[in-house]
């Protein structure tokens, strides 16, 4: 969901392809904002995950990403909107990591934590690959990223919904 969205704010000139003709410095500042916001968002999510339902926080993060991405692509793109998008999306980007790992540990214990989280991480890498690959294919077909951005919005909404049925209570009779 996130990986295919990075292309339009990279420092490689892709901002120009969506109509922003400022220098590549905007891309560099955008990436920096994403990184800074990542730190704040990830620490905050971990803190919140110790106090509130992880599944609802994850659903909220994916919903937030979906809303932010939708707003970004339906409003006029300006240097300011790129920076705002970068800060907001950056705050949610890796915020899922402490919540997902915490949820796995809570549900399945820590005995197989490395294996289970490794599988989750691997599945995210597959999704990242297919998101970027599909984004490139769709750009070749249509000449812009609009279609893949809408697909990303759909994936974000689906990600929010699939977290809701998670049962956060552990069956302690199961060995861990």
Locations of regions flagged by a protein language model:
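Extracytoplasmic gate region of multi-pass secondary transporters
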Residues: 1-45, 131
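Intracellular helix-loop hinge segments at the cytoplasmic ends of transmembrane helices
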Residues: 9, 13, 98-107
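Interfacial helix-cap and linker-helix signal at transmembrane-aqueous boundaries
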Residues: 15-19, 48-49, 134-143
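C-terminal transmembrane helical hairpin of 12-TM major facilitator-type secondary transporters
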Residues: 26, 33-38, 44, 49-103
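Transmembrane alpha-helical cores of Major Facilitator Superfamily
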Residues: 32-36, 63, 118-126
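A late C-terminal transmembrane helix in Major Facilitator Superfamily
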Residues: 94, 107-142
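Multi-pass alpha-helical transporter architecture, strongest
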Residues: 153-176
């Amino acid at each position: 969901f996130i990986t295919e969205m990075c292309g339009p704010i990279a420092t490689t000139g892709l901002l120009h392809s969506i109509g922003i003709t400022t220098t590549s410095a905007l891309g560099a500042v955008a990436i920096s904002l994403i990184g800074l916001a990542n730190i704040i968002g990830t620490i905050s999510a971990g803190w919140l995950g110790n106090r509130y339902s992880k599944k609802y926080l994850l659903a909220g993060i994916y919903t937030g990403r979906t809303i932010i991405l939708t707003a970004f692509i339906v409003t006029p793109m300006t240097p300011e909107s790129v920076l705002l998008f970068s800060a907001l999306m950056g705050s949610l980007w890796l915020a899922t990591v402490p919540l997902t790992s915490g949820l796995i540990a809570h549900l399945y214990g820590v005995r197989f934590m490395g294996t289970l989280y490794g599988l989750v991480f691997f599945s995210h890498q597959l999704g990242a690959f297919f998101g970027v690959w599909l984004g490139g294919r769709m750009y070749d077909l249509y000449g812009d990223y609009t279609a893949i951005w809408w697909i990303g919005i759909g994936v974000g909404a689906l990600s929010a919904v699939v977290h809701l049925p998670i049962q956060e209570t552990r069956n302690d009779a199961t060995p861990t």
